[in-house]
Amino acid sequence: YVGPAQGTPREDWALKPPPELLDLKICDPAMVSGAFLVQACRWLADRLVEAWSRAEAQGHFVGIDGRVVAGDAEALPRDTETRTIVARRLIAERCLYGVDLNPLAVELAKLSIWLVTLAKGRPFGFLDHNLRCGDSLLGIHRLDQLTQLSMNPTGHDQLRLFGRNIEQAVHEAIELRSRLREMPIRDIRDVETMAHLDADARRRLEVPESIADIFIGEVFASGGGGATLENKLISLTVQAGQAIDGDRDVLALMRRRVIAALSTDLPADKPARRPFHWPLEFPEVF
């Protein structure tokens, strides 16, 4: 709604139009089985159906994909039940994001949201790109932390070459994920196409993610600062440039360092910590 943030009385709130509702981003950083996201899906879908009705009452045309479009497109069905199903699918695919450290919880969340969308004729897996596994409290939350290799970047340092290359990779991933986000899903072929787009975006970010992992690992292992960390980051700056330039041997070395750094103070039988880098996992949001 337009109004709550401005302190407007409830009776004067105005529902946002469909494009703005579909551009919302709702994230649960510890989603477990997805209960919060399921309720968010239901509530927002009801608001979207309401917004469609208001748009039509104002003389606009709503297409089958939920967009307010020109009148020559296929029309959205009029019955409320069908509209609710379409709205839930659109909200689930375009607006909901979730993270959990437990891989099983991630799969349960996918199943929970799939069930609430009533997408019984739709293949399972269409939320793979938005529901991810990792430690939402461990990782970078701003891209410049990675491009400057600093947890507190000033913005005044000249961007290194590897930093510019990382930014380029992120921009390419955003373009791919934007195509994925706008893609309608009707059958298994659409899901496969989405999976290919997501995999392509992940490949673009493979090296930046490895650099982010070792960066966070070294920060974690050093306790967050000190001369030891400074020396390690100087070394990482050189290795990051080599890895971005395609040196697979350096990249493999960095990945071995990651496991050691992210296993600091863990029992020997425990797997290494699993950072979650928000600007790389959800680049179109961050």
Model-predicted regions and their roles:
Residues V32, R94-L96:
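Catalytic palm active-site di-aspartate
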